[in-house]
Design a protein with these regions (language model features):
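Active-site neighborhood of glycoside hydrolase catalytic domains
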Residues: 1-12, 71
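Alpha-helical scaffolding within the catalytic cores
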Residues: 2-3, 14-26
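Active-site regions of enzymes building and remodeling cell-envelope glycoconjugates
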Residues: 9-17, 29-32
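Substrate-binding clefts and catalytic carboxylate motifs of secreted carbohydrate-active enzymes
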Residues: 22-130
Length: 130
C-alpha cells in the first residue's frame, strides 16, 4: 500500500519514496519492498503529451539523468543486504500524460539515458565489470 498509509497487515511492508531509495525495516513476518522510487525527469520537447508535465527530480540532460540513475540503483543494491530489501520498483519506465518521470518519452521515440550504463546499474555491477 505504500507509506505513509501503513496498515501493519499482509506479508509485505511497502514504501514509496521519491527519488529515494529507502527501505522499510523488514520483520520476521513481513518482507521489505520499495514499491516506488526514482521519478527522475528529463522532459524532451516534441515528445511530451502535454506541455505541463512534471517530475520528482529534474535532470539537465542524458548524461546527468544516467548518472543520477546509476547513483539511485547503487544505493538500492546496498539496501538489499542492510536492512534487507526484498524488491524495488523504479518509477517509471515511460512518461505518461502528466508525468515526465519516464526513462523513455511518452511517444516511445527517445530513450533518455545511456542503455549500457543503465543495464549495468540494474544488475548491480559498474560498467566494465563482468
Amino acid at each position: 500500500n505504500g507509506m505513509p498509509f501503513e496498515t501493519k497487515s499482509g506479508d509485505v511492508i511497502d514504501a514509496h519514496i521519491y527519488p529515494g531509495p529507502y527501505s522499510p525495516e523488514p520483520t520476521a513476518e513481513r518482507a521489505a519492498v520499495l514499491g516506488e522510487f526514482g521519478g527522475l525527469s528529463l522532459p524532451v520537447e516534441g515528445h511530451k503529451w502535454s506541455p505541463n508535465v512534471w517530475g520528482h527530480k529534474k535532470a539537465a540532460d542524458l548524461k546527468a539523468l544516467t548518472a543520477e540513475y546509476e547513483q539511485l540503483l547503487a544505493k538500492t543494491w546496498e539496501l538489499k543486504d542492510k536492512p534487507g530489501l526484498s524488491g524495488a520498483i523504479y518509477t517509471q519506465l515511460t512518461d505518461v500524460e502528466s508525468e515526465g518521470n519516464g526513462l523513455v518519452t511518452y511517444d516511445r521515440e527517445v530513450i533518455k539515458l545511456d542503455l549500457e550504463r543503465a543495464k549495468a546499474a540494474n544488475t548491480g555491477k559498474p560498467p566494465g565489470q563482468p
